[in-house]
Regions:
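Vicinal oxygen chelate
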Residues: 15-87, 121-137, 146, 151-175
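Long, hydrophobic/aromatic-enriched structural stretches that serve as scaffold segments
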Residues: 1-12
Length: 175
């Protein structure tokens, strides 16, 4: 059905997450280890529960910079005009057991888990993952994407309803 299907995380050493996944019985469904040192793994959505999760490393010391090397974008993207109009700052997972899923992801991703009201959150340097309980659903899924709009003119040109837009069944919250 309609929902987001993949979350991609960039890190310094994707191979360490691949090893950790094996210890946690999280299966991979795709692996890539390129000659230039780029490594990536897609983890099975039934083991991650809710999405295909990809953990990628680019063999680039500046990997934490917004405009650093990204293998999957091709050879020219760093030469293109930069778009600073918006930034992705979070996602929301709808879960039939938010406590269990958030604890599993916290353990796997090495991100701190905090509880704010009845929402479990994983917090990183520049994004967060929210886990919302919905006991009426059969499957966990990515329901919302949080986007910070940095350019007011760009925001004014969008068809915004209730502080967001909907694309393929995923509500994109604009902050």
């Amino acid at each position: 059905g309609d929902s987001g299907y993949m979350l991609i995380f960039q890190c310094d050493n994707a191979l360490a997450y691949r090893e950790k996944a094996e210890k946690l019985n999280i299966r991979s469904i795709w692996k890539s280890d390129l000659d230039n040192g780029v490594s990536a793994t897609h983890f099975h959505p039934k083991d991650i529960n809710g999405v295909i999760m990809s953990i990628d490393s680019m063999n680039d010391e500046s990997w934490e910079e917004k405009y650093s090397y990204w293998q999957w974008a091709g050879n020219n993207w760093l030469n293109e005009e930069k778009n600073n109009a918006f930034s992705i700052i979070g996602v929301t997972m709808k879960c039939n057991n938010s406590k269990s899923l958030s604890e599993k992801w916290s353990l796997f991703l090495d991100l701190p888990l905090v509880l704010e009201g009845n929402i479990s959150k994983l917090k990183a340097k520049d994004f967060e993952i929210n886990f919302i309980e919905d006991t009426n659903i059969e499957f966990n899924y990515m329901a919302e994407l949080d986007v910070k709009v940095n350019d007011q003119d760009y925001r004014d040109s969008m068809d915004i309803q209730e502080n967001g837009v909907s694309v393929c069944g995923v509500k994109i919250n604009l902050t």
